[in-house]
């Protein structure tokens, strides 16, 4: 996360602000902090979860190595960042990191870029949940994962998903049964292949993007 050309004293200053977290799969990287935090996910994968009344949970976003993640302090809802696989992360107090970053344009640029990416993904997700069918939602999810963690395999793309189908369902506002049914339909249509519970091959990215309701002019290449 830090600029590669950062002077030693600058590097030490940033490192002093953060605390290292090494967490096993299922563990809490950040949980209901009293202040807003920014988390750099150095390795692994995680989910940002919001908690509402009556023990209701919502998977807000999935995150992967290299992401800078904003975890709000409890307000209308409480939040936690939970590891989907063994993960290493550095947790910063958001206000302090932002204050120090004002003196270091490269770091501030990294934070702004991360904020822009998060805003874009949030807008896309609001469209997916608000306007799209179950089939389109699942196709959108697969395309999104392909862009972020997909492994090219010729004209195909392989996904090794760290999240459960329950997590996917919660993220998309669907049931587990609907997720399984839609994956089965996409498999039957020749758009994907599945292996076990976590490996999915995307066989036709252009057709899958069309299935997701993407505009034709948008590129479906990884």
Where do the PLM segments sit?
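A short beta-loop-beta micro-motif enriched in histidine and acidic residues
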Residues: 16-17, 25-38, 56-57, 75-78, ...
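Short beta-strand segments in beta-sandwich/barrel cores
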Residues: 19, 28, 45-50, 68, ...
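A cytosolic small-molecule/anion-sensing beta-strand core signal
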Residues: 24, 42-43, 64, 85, ...
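Glycine- and acidic-residue-biased ligand/ion/polar-headgroup-sensing regions
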Residues: 35-49, 65-66
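Cyclic-nucleotide recognition modules
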Residues: 59-120, 124
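Phosphate-/nucleic-acid-contacting segments
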Residues: 147-222
């Amino acid at each position: 996360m830090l600029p590669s050309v950062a002077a030693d004293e600058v590097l030490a200053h940033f490192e002093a602000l953060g605390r290292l977290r090494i967490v096993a799969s299922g563990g809490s990287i950040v949980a209901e902090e009293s202040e807003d935090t920014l988390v750099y996910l150095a390795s692994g994968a995680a989910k940002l979860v919001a908690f509402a009344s009556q023990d209701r949970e919502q998977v807000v976003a999935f995150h992967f190595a290299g992401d800078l993640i904003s975890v709000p302090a409890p307000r209308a809802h409480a939040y936690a960042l939970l590891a989907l696989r063994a993960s290493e992360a550095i947790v910063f107090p958001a206000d302090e990191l932002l204050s120090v970053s004002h003196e270091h344009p490269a770091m501030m640029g990294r934070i702004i870029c991360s904020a822009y990416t998060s805003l874009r993904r949030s807008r896309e997700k609001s469209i997916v949940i608000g306007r799209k069918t179950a089939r389109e939602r699942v196709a959108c999810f697969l395309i999104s994962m392909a862009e972020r963690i997909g492994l090219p395999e010729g004209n195909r793309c392989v996904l090794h998903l760290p999240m459960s189908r329950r997590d996917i369902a919660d993220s998309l506002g669907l049931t587990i049964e609907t997720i399984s049914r839609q994956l089965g339909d996409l498999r039957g249509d020749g758009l994907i292949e599945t292996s076990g519970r976590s490996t999915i091959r995307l066989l036709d990215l252009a057709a899958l993007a069309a299935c997701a309701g993407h505009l034709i002019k948008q590129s479906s290449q990884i």
